Amino acid sequence: DVAGLVPAKDSPAFQKRAAAAVNTTAD
């Protein structure tokens, strides 16, 4: 798991996932 290597807030994958979650919630 690379989550421990890169801060979640700095992870592009996390940002993309978070954005998708926000968009889904907004819908």
Curated annotation (Swiss-Prot):
Keywords: Photosynthesis, Photosystem I. Disulfide bonds: none annotated. Residues 1-27 are annotated as: Disordered. Transmembrane segments: none annotated. One of its GO terms (cellular component) is photosystem I. One of its GO terms (biological process) is photosynthesis. Probably participates in efficiency of electron transfer from plastocyanin to P700 (or cytochrome c553 in algae and cyanobacteria). This plastocyanin-docking protein contributes to the specific association of plastocyanin to PSI. This is Photosystem I reaction center subunit III. It comes from Thermostichus vulcanus (Synechococcus vulcanus).
